[in-house]
Amino acid sequence: MANELFAGSQVIVYASREATYGTARRLNGTDAMLTISESFTPAEERDVRPDRSGFTDHLDRYRGRKSATFEITRLLLPSGSVTTEPDDDLLWQNAFGRLSINSTGVEYILATAHDWSLTLRRAIRTGGGQGVADFQEHVRGAIVNQVEISEGNQGQNGLATVTFRGVAKDWGWTGNTSVASGYLNIATSATTFRVSSPRQLSVGSLFKVFNTNTGGGSGILVNTVNYTTGVIAYSQSLSATLSSGRVLVPYNPTATTAGQPLHARIGLLSLDGSATKIDHLGGRVTLEDNRGLLNEEVGYDSASRVIRENRRNVTASFGFILKKDEVGELLGRRDRNDSRNLQLNIGDAANKTCKIHMKDFEWDMTALEIPDQGMARVTMSGRGLGVNGNDSLKVRFL
């Protein structure tokens, strides 16, 4: 059999809400989202021993705490219905803390002490194509602590984008292996069996056996792996009995996604919280929530819970071509440190609009850009402030 490759063009990302911090979750096709790019980065303390050994070489390293980071960039995609969350709903919810849905829209509102977490999975889903194979990596105990929305000339080829960044407890992977030799009939009620190559799996791996044995439809979740004996443990009931040689592959279900891109040519920026429009070139709005993970206590090899480490930061920047009648509106108010009720609409159609609201926004001091050729420009940046608490930023899909 050929040693198949993994096709990077066929990536799907899935997000699932964890019931217990750091305990990986199974998934369904409705947990999927389309992405532009993403990265899952594992980390573990591995350093050389500091004691002297009588040699000029380092002889050993020690292992410490594990962690992971992630970044997911995707198009800003309203679902197409004002009462339905977008595909990346769990990422928005985890970053902001609160979700409100009514007959006019889906709204993400900041919260103080939300501490729930996610399992994120990046899958290469090939469908058994010739010369290629499925693969999956995951992070568990993940939280989103930074969101960056880009639109206009700051977006992707004129399309609005959103980037989610965060930290996680641990990283893992799901490769391809098979049921080990010596099995004639593994019962559907079994919770362990040996695999031929245990290093293809890790804690939190999600697999199916052959094409139909999916543990009830959401994949079979690996609880533990013994890399010496090859025994894996799981909790799901098998859909059918197993025997040696049956192939184990990552469980990457068909994605169910929705939404249409929002282009830079549609939308408005208002500095007074209404529909009064001021022309701009594009902008970027960033939320840094400053939640982190507790990964310091004795007795743990990775993070054990979510903690708030500091106050959040909401910032934004927008580019303008400087016009005669707008000097006072931009430079005059900036110089006086006037607060603004800033509203950014990306899109303008029902069911296809994202509204970003910062009701107390103050500009920073910024230099003008006056080139030898072309028109004078200014990039205005500033900070969103809270008024009554947890209201420095709101995002609505209308």
Identify the residue ranges that each predicted region occupies.
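Signature of extracytoplasmic/envelope-associated structural regions
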Residues: 1-398
